Regions:
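Non-ligating segments of multi-cofactor redox enzymes
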Residues: 1-220
Length: 220
């Protein structure tokens, strides 16, 4: 893997509304095989309009975003001789949170959610592509967390404090959202939306899609 190859991958990702969120270099080879992995997420606000035109979205299949992500990222991984991994797979379960913290692009926020240098708390992963050869690729050293100079509006944003006390209170969150179809949270998690970094990138329609899917997953 070289810087030139990374640029080529980023160009292809952009065609599908995706972006390179950071690269993790493994101290010990992942699965005794892979040296590095590129974390991939939506390139917002462009991502949503591209995904809406996909066959997965328009056909009404179950879990359209996961199916679309797998189709697209699998094809990109194959093109560049990598292997794709996903946050929704089970075997093996991929530690995206830990990987992200080792890219130099992410930090743990005061509410424990990951915060990205450009995407803030709205960051999300669609997948990762792992490669076997690092080729002396140098990864940017980690900067100071942007949270150090932030007033942390995320801490006070949740109406039921579902993300305090170092845990996520799913029950309280779901009960509040389910009280009304017009819940203030249906347009996206208030905690995530309060982060000043990248808060204007995500479209409301996309946030609604994610929240409705999240609710359906909890109550299925």
């Amino acid at each position: 893997m070289t810087k030139n190859n990374i640029l080529k991958i980023e160009i292809v990702l952009k065609e599908f509304g995706l972006t390179n969120l950071g690269i993790v270099v493994f101290n010990n080879r992942f699965l005794k095989k892979y040296d590095i992995a590129m974390l991939i997420g939506p390139d917002e606000p462009f991502f949503w309009d591209i995904f809406k035109k996909s066959k997965e979205f328009t056909s009404g299949v179950k879990n359209p975003l996961n199916k679309w992500s797998k189709r697209i990222i699998d094809s990109i991984a194959k093109k560049f001789s990598g292997t794709a991994f996903y946050p929704f797979q089970n075997n093996p379960i991929i530690p995206f949170y830990d990987w992200a913290l080792n890219t130099g692009k992410f930090w743990q926020s005061p509410v424990k959610l990951l915060v990205h240098e450009r995407r803030g708390l709205m960051v999300s992963f669609r997948g990762a592509i792992a490669f076997e050869n690092r080729n002396n690729l140098n990864i940017q050293k980690k900067k100071n967390s942007p949270c150090l100079t932030c007033s942390a509006p995320c801490v006070r944003a949740c109406p039921v404090n579902a993300l305090n006390n170092n845990k996520y209170d799913v029950k309280s969150c779901m009960q509040f959202i389910s009280k009304s179809k017009n819940s203030i949270c249906i347009d996206g998690c208030l905690v995530r939306r309060e982060c000043p970094i990248g808060k204007s990138y995500r479209k409301i329609e996309q946030s609604r899609f994610h929240m409705k899917h999240f609710i359906n997953e909890v109550y299925k």
